[in-house]
Amino acid sequence: MKFAVIGNPISHSLSPVMHRANFNSLGLDDTYEALNIPIEDFHLIKEIISKKELDGFNITIPHKERIIPYLDHVDEQAINAGAVNTVLIKDDKWIGYNTDGIGYVKGLHSVYPDLENAYILILGAGGASKGIAYELAKFVKPKLTVANRTMARFESWNLNINQISLADAEKYLAEFDIVINTTPAGMAGNNESIINLKHLSPNTLMSDIVYIPYKTPILEEAERKGNHIYNGLDMFVYQGAESFKIWTNKDADINSMKTAVLQQLKGE
């Protein structure tokens, strides 16, 4: 079977390394490549994919929303998130999914087993936040709060959860067991701080969905305060495993995928 990841730029993507490690571990001869498709060429997506004879693909920035009009069917989770990151090609039909939310929550559950009883704060209200919020709401809806700079961003959310400003989030930070940053603040080359951690409880797990850098500024600050921290590496691995399951109906080798990504990040 043939798979790919599509984005622009895409040369930095660790998806090929991760998926190939999984294929090797499972004894599969499947292939996975990175395809750079600029925005101005995206209208050719059907033609490009057809020539590659792909069975499915991942789609990343900046095309997660742009792909939707080209799909024959969109899964409920992707509709809720307003974005697609996985496409299955079956009987010439393109079916879109979003595995980011379930990928993050599966990873979080592995390090925080008592998720159902946690009070959780999500920082940011973009596509990633939306997907994660919809998945977390299955566990902790009454205890889930999302904070954003502007409240207008929530107008498209069809989810009845607590919504507050970032200023209020800073004020009530001590009340949360888990704080999740879903904003681009802290990504490689971006040292912006999304929120002041002055009131962060020492028992709070501080999380960021970014994994490059391995520790974002907000995670470093929380760690200096003595908090446990959790980056986006597991989310990346688990969302990839969920994509593989959609394409093949097989379980992925999580350990081989995570090891391959860690080795790449360490330059091994």
UniProtKB/Swiss-Prot annotation:
Its EC number is 1.1.1.25. NADP(+) binds at residues 76, 124-128, 148-153, 209, 232. One of its GO terms (biological process) is amino acid biosynthetic process. GO terms for cellular component: cytosol. InterPro entries: Aminoacid_DH-like_N_sf, NAD(P)-bd_dom_sf, SDH_C, Shikimate_DH, Shikimate_DH-bd_N, Shikimate_DH_fam, Shikm_DH/Glu-tRNA_Rdtase. Pathway: Metabolic intermediate biosynthesis; chorismate biosynthesis; chorismate from D-erythrose 4-phosphate and phosphoenolpyruvate: step 4/7. The active site is at residue 64. Shikimate binds at residues 13-15, 60, 85, 100, 211. NCBIfam families: aroE. Homodimer. Belongs to the shikimate dehydrogenase family. This is Shikimate dehydrogenase (NADP(+)). The gene is aroE.
